[in-house]
Amino acid sequence: MRVGNVKEIVFSKDPKQMNWLREDFPYAEVKCPPEFSAEVQNEKDGDVLTTKIVVSYNGAHPYFTNAGSIGVSFPLQDRYTDSVTCRDYRCHAHVFCGENTSYIMALRMGGAAPHLGMVLTKGSLSAYSIERDLKLQSNDRGCFWLHPSAQEFAPGDTMTLEWKVFPHQGREDFREKLRAFSQVILVDAEQYVIYPGETSKVTIEPTFPAEKVTVNGVSLEKTEKGVYEYLFENEKTGEYVLSICVDEVKTICRLLVQERPEELAAKRCAFIVDHQQYHGKIKELQGAYLPYDNEEKILVCTPENDFNAGRERTGMGVLIARALQQNLLKDREKAEQSLREYHAFYLRELVNAATGLVCNCSGKDNSYFRLYNYPWAVTFFLECWKLWGEKEDLKTAVHITEKFYEQDGFRFYPIEMPIVMLCQELEKAGEQEDLKTVRDLFRRHADQLIEIGTAYPASEVNYEQSIVQPAAEVILQVYEVTGEEKYLCGAEQQIAVLELFDGQQPDYHLHEIAIRHWDGYWFGKRRVFGDTFPHYWSAENGRTFKRYAR
């Protein structure tokens, strides 16, 4: 049945009757240069919506488009209001613009089916972009614009895009449903990130009978399993795009060859020591690790939260302390002296070691109250204790932990609270009284998070991966410390929700990488909102999944 403008997509068997389309952007609107025109047709067959877009070139001379010349809107409900609304009426949109094989796997944030799927059945998409209301800042991913692949148009030429929207029951069902479409090539890599000298087997499975399959022009033979396999390896670091062609159908797979962590850490630490530590005339900043502008080759420091000398900058001190413990650094003496200076800065400007107060900015300025700073400070002093064995650092870590919970930390979702490490180090040091104190605090914290369940309170963002992951991580660490089964069950409830943030596209930016779409604004020089895959907090999911697997 042909329908007009589509303003809602609601699946008939959805008890929540969620509208998957947001109301502030039109569906399947086409943006193109003035020399082009577009016609959009929509047809419904039960819960399946077919959208066909024909773009015509009306100019008098040839026109070569690029991947951004033409865009088609797909306004999904990927935005954060409150956690209860998100659970039932919002989605994580996992988008793959892989030329002829392009799709969207949208998962309801609470995990309940039906979910939404979209698959391209005609044409080619090479990219997507996002339009958003900047007033909503981190709480709205925005409207997706799908961009057709570059094309050469002669006068009178047309281009057709067609896709189908359908309900599905989750990841596995979505993948199965893709097999029904004749323009789909299923691609999986054994590893999307490898180190020099390693290999990654890429499996290619067309959903249609194939005569010729190539990767970067190299022909492949079908295996006994009925699929095609390509062994990727490269000694040179960097991004690699595999161009996959099955007869006339094209798609891609993106892989990354990355330096080994110990080599990368050594280079990073050397850069911090050489370029990011302050030794200038301002006493307040002596020894501080600061942001660095790689274009202008200068240190960056403003009173603004994300560019001051506190907060996330603590991670630089943690990294150097850990690298020193593992003997990764060539100039150990220089790095250790640098860390001593940073340690002195931290005690002088950011922390009250006696009370455990952690300030947001140097000068012991705590006018902006932020509990996120506490677990990072605990981790920093723990790493210093492990490196130097000075009891004051261990005591400071305990005091900071106690202060965190004095300030209603039991209802907070901290990123990287080192529960297991603190308990282990107190055990080793024979500090049984402190061990009992912090263990009881951690247990109360986990109990509170289990009681809250998935009705998460808003934090710096209304709802996000780094609210759900800390819930899973805190509860899972308390299970590791106590061995009590209720904490494992509580963590599993959180992990089921956490997994929904991760995509499964054949691209190292997206595969098993949690959705984050605001970090480029808060921490980037360009101050641009938009998808940031991967971001360093994306690694937190891996931390939790690894702990759960153990």
Feature roles, as predicted:
Residues K31-F36, Q41-E43, Y63-S73, L107-Y192:
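Beta-strand-rich recognition/accessory modules
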Residues P155-G156, I194-T199, T223-K225:
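Solvent-exposed, conformationally flexible loop/turn segments
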Residues L256-P303, K334-L357, K391-F410, D434-A458, ...:
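Long, well-ordered core segments of solenoidal/helical folds
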Residues V10-A127:
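Polysaccharide-binding surfaces and accessory modules of carbohydrate-active proteins
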Residues L186-P209:
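Solvent-exposed, low-complexity, repeat-rich "mucin-like" stalks and linkers
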